[in-house]
Amino acid sequence: MLHLQIFHPEYDVPGVGKMIMEAGIARQNAAQAKAEGNEEEALKQTELAQKLTKDAYAKLHHDMQHFVNEATVEQLNQIKESIASCAHKAMLAGIDAIEVHGDRLLGSLCSEVLNHRSDVYGGSFENRIRYALEVVKAIKEAAPDLTIEYKLPIITLNKDGSLRGKGGLKEAEGIAFAKKLEEVGVDMIQVAQANHTGNMGDTIPPMGDVPYNWTLPVARKVKEVVSIPVATGNVQLYGTSPIGGIVSPIFPVWLVKKS
């Protein structure tokens, strides 16, 4: 099965083009130079690609931290149409399944922590999840043959009771949202840690800060309310999910013994 994650739809974000196009061209030039035996030019092009990527990431991060405006309804509609267009092209290209990245924009709109809108996309739980459901419906209409996986970001708690992550839903709302996702046609859900705090320690906390595979209990609760598969890791601990990641080198051995 060919699987594609829709992360950056085809709308213009300054800096993304530089990362993809200019840096990509530099990498191609480096490979060509190396194939021709010109190590000096290969090194030069490699360093150029690294610099272009680093500079673009730095600008994007700075702009996201300091110059973020509330998206207009027109902009949200444009993004939704672009995501649907990406899905349609993926289907035509032979892709079998896509994952909708439910963090970032969708997670921010779903989040009661980050979403301060006063229109139809803000306020109540129903309003905050409205856009994400619209995106899924648009994908289903544009690419009816695709299997849709949805990455569901859950805001969890630190040891001191503070929130870990912002761009997602708290546990109770996340479970309720999972049922809505199934109703609009999502075929599979991946339960993940919410982020969007600018701190990677939220998404990948230091060892010892949280129990190993701390999202598994939430994934289990999600699975209890939906009939579709819920993707998670280390499924041998619970036996409730038909899909899991290979989180240990002995996982294949466990599968063979279990079968």
Model-derived features: positions:
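Flavin-dependent oxidoreductase catalytic cores
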Residues: M1-S259
